[in-house]
């Protein structure tokens, strides 16, 4: 399917926070309770619609283990968006956010949009990190914030789409150089065939998709 833009994402965070499950829920709309550890990097893709334009999201799911950190770093450079994930039932994953964020900002382009995600919101009885703590961390570091559940699909769609909306807004504002693919944005065939509009940011519903 033709698209106006392709946005590259990277999903980062500690092992076991649900990165692969979030990707699977977004691309395939299913939950896999037992998931093998990601070894290196896995990949998924889906089409969405923003402001009447088809946007292809190309999403790289990275391993959380320290031994794979150098591989993860190489994917920061070509990403327009990052989903930084922690597990609300494991405080250590929240405590490690600063390290992940420093790594991301050191190795990515300065305009990369970062969405902070507190995953496993369905496990409220086991919560160790308050929602207010996530909100405060996001405010302090200039991030977008949502709590999600890869199991129930709560806010999963919104997390990926809202990140794309932020990227799209930056394109409209001229913040991103869309002719430089190192920024994680590629102009698609649909954009070339039509005049780019500079209207408001509307929509964001799925237009179909699948896992690649």
Swiss-Prot record:
Q: Which reaction does it catalyse?
A: GTP + H2O = GDP + phosphate + H(+)
Keyword Transmembrane among record annotations? no
Query: One MF term in GO for this entry?
Result: G protein activity
- Amino acid composition bias (Gly residues), ranges on this chain: 200-212
Which parts of the sequence form the motif Switch 2? 63-72
Q: Does the keyword Hydrolase apply?
A: yes
Q: Where in the cell is it found?
A: Endoplasmic reticulum-Golgi intermediate compartment membrane; Melanosome; Endoplasmic reticulum membrane; Golgi apparatus membrane
Stretches for region Disordered: 190-212
Description of how activity is regulated = Regulated by guanine nucleotide exchange factors (GEFs) which promote the exchange of bound GDP for free GTP, GTPase activating proteins (GAPs) which increase the GTP hydrolysis activity, and GDP dissociation inhibitors (GDIs) which inhibit the dissociation of the nucleotide from the GTPase.
Q: Give a GO biological-process term.
A: autophagosome-lysosome fusion
Modified sites of kind N-acetylalanine: 2
Function (record text):
The small GTPases Rab are key regulators of intracellular membrane trafficking, from the formation of transport vesicles to their fusion with membranes. Rabs cycle between active GTP-bound and inactive GDP-bound states. In their active state, drive transport of vesicular carriers from donor organelles to acceptor organelles to regulate the membrane traffic that maintains organelle identity and morphology.
Q: How does it assemble?
A: Interacts with PRKCI. Interacts with TRIP11. Interacts (in GTP-bound form) with GARIN1B. Interacts (GTP-bound) with HOPS complex component VPS39; interaction contributes to obtaining a functional HOPS complex that promotes autophagosome-lysosome membrane fusion driven by STX17-SNAP29-VAMP8. May interact with VPS41.
Any idea what this protein is called? Ras-related protein Rab-2A
């Amino acid at each position: 399917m033709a698209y106006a833009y392709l946005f590259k994402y990277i999903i980062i965070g500690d092992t076991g926070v649900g990165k692969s499950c979030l990707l699977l829920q977004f691309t395939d709309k299913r939950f896999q309770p037992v998931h093998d550890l990601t070894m290196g990097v896995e990949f998924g893709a889906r089409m969405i619609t923003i402001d009447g334009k088809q946007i292809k999201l190309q999403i790289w799911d990275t391993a959380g283990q320290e031994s794979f950190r150098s591989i993860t770093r190489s994917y920061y450079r070509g990403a327009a968006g990052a989903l930084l994930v922690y597990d609300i039932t494991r405080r250590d994953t929240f405590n490690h956010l600063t390290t992940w964020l420093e790594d991301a900002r050191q190795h990515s382009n300065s305009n990369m949009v970062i969405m902070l995600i507190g995953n496993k919101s369905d496990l409220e009885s086991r919560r160790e990190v308050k929602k207010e703590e996530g909100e405060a961390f996001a405010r302090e570091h200039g991030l977008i914030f949502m709590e999600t559940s890869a199991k129930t699909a709560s806010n999963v769609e919104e997390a990926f789409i809202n990140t794309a909306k932020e990227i799209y807004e930056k394109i409209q504002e001229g913040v991103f150089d869309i002719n430089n693919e190192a920024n994680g944005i590629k102009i698609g065939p649909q954009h070339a065939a039509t005049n780019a509009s500079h209207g408001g940011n509307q929509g964001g519903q799925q237009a179909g998709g699948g896992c690649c």
